[in-house]
């Protein structure tokens, strides 16, 4: 039972919802109550979160090496224990040193528990057959904010922000730790997995070993650019379009469509993307982002333009998450997969940490139209990187 694909996917899906919901999304709800109660600026509160992202980038490669040596079960279990301790530290913080230390702990935990570690665990068990399970797993992760934003909100209302962080810590400890411990042990290869016979040999990677660094560089540029866009707009989209003349209520409900279409994009990939050329898949996911920004970069802030943006933006983000997990597997093979994800994650985490402050500066200095032009150009850079990847390495595969 515990070694079956349905159990593994369900267990990892639950733990991704809980881990993302607590370690990444909880701060969105609890930042202001913390700032008011502790007397700290919201800038400092979010600085702690940025420190977590930077730490995640620093420890990404050591964490990947540990996973490759000791396996996903031990890595994920340790990550859950570390994560619950970091969340507990947040609930007890009364000075700034402890607060920053808590985020440092959570930065380490995130590299041991979130998508990259879960993707690598699936590849450990299923090899190249993990592509479809990776796509399915991303559907679970898309629910994290939908579930944990209300949990954190109502917990804060009922028992305060400290109690809310304790709820987060308990969720990780009680739900994630035992589910991770039930994963198959290191070295086990699942014979009955998705798609093909478990005994069949893996096909040759599409990217030859001597060109691996070049391909990783191009993918890293694409992922870092998209991480910058996603994080910057998560923080600033609503106030930016309000300054363009849109009501706050309209901006709010339009922005909320992003999550719905992010999940829809992942679901469509599951239905129609099984045999899609990985280079084409990457081009489509980043190309949609370029199209999404075109009307906003031109200064359009009408409701139809904003609706079209949210729909296309959400679909693009949903697809890019799958690209991040599945395409490297096809391009580079299963061997060293965790290390490849770590190499791809590091620049993206740095971009994510810098994005809110950098984009706020652009908006303050030049306004939202220039800000959307910047996002449009960053999207073009991402699309250009995937086009260059396809031009350099496509071998007529499907």
Regions found by a protein language model. Name each.
Residues 17, 97-113, 224, 305-318:
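Hydrophobic core of transmembrane alpha-helices in multi-pass small-molecule transporters
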Residues 27-31, 212-267:
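Extracytoplasmic gate region of multi-pass secondary transporters
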Residues 34, 112-126, 319-332:
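Intracellular juxtamembrane helix-capping segments at the cytosolic ends
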Residues 34-35, 66-67, 150-159, 241-242, ...:
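Interfacial helix-cap and linker-helix signal at transmembrane-aqueous boundaries
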Residues 58-71, 265-277, 363-364:
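Helix-to-loop junctions at the C-terminal end of transmembrane segments
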Residues 81-94, 288-300:
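C-terminal ends and interior cores of transmembrane alpha-helices
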Residues 140-187:
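Helix-loop-helix hairpin linking two adjacent transmembrane segments in secondary transporters
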Residues 275-327:
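C-terminal transmembrane helical hairpin of 12-TM major facilitator-type secondary transporters
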């Amino acid at each position: 039972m515990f070694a079956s694909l349905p159990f593994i996917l369900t267990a990892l899906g639950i733990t991704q919802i809980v881990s993302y919901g607590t370690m990444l999304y909880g701060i969105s709800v609890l930042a202001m109550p913390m700032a008011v109660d502790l007397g700290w600026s919201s800038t400092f509160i979010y600085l702690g979160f940025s420190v977590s992202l930077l730490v995640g980038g620093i420890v990404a490669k050591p964490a990947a090496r540990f996973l490759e040596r000791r396996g996903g079960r031990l890595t994920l279990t340790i990550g859950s224990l570390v994560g619950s301790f970091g969340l507990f530290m947040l609930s007890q913080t009364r000075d700034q040193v402890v607060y920053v230390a808590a985020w440092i702990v959570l930065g380490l935990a995130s590299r041991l528990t979130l998508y990259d570690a879960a993707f690598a665990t699936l590849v450990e068990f299923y090899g190249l057959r993990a592509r479809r399970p990776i796509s399915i797993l991303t559907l679970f992760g898309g629910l994290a904010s939908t579930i944990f934003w209300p949990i954190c909100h109502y917990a804060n209302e009922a028992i305060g922000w400290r109690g809310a962080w304790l709820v987060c810590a308990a969720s990780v400890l009680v739900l994630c730790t035992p589910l991770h411990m039930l994963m198959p042990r290191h070295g086990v290869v699942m014979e009955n997995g998705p798609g093909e016979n478990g005994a069949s040999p893996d096909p040759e990677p599409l990217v030859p070993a001597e060109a691996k660094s070049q391909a990783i560089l191009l993918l890293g540029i694409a992922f870092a650019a998209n991480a910058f866009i996603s994080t910057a707009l998560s923080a600033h989209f609503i106030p930016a379009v309000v300054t363009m003349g849109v009501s706050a209520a309209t901006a709010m409900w339009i922005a909320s469509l992003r999550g719905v279409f992010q999940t829809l994009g992942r679901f469509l990939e599951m239905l129609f993307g099984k045999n899609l050329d990985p280079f084409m898949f990457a081009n489509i996911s980043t190309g949609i982002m370029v199209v999404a920004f075109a009307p906003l970069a031109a200064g359009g802030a009408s409701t139809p333009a904003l609706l079209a943006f949210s729909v296309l933006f959400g679909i693009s983000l949903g697809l890019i998450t799958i690209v991040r997990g599945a395409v490297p597997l096809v391009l580079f093979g299963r061997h060293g997969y965790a290390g490849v994800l770590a190499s791809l994650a590091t620049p993206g985490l740095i971009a994510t940490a810098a994005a809110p402050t950098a984009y706020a500066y652009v908006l303050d200095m030049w306004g939202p139209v220039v800000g959307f032009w910047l996002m449009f150009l960053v999207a073009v850079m991402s699309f250009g990187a995937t086009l260059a990847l396809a031009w350099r390495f496509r071998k007529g595969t499907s």
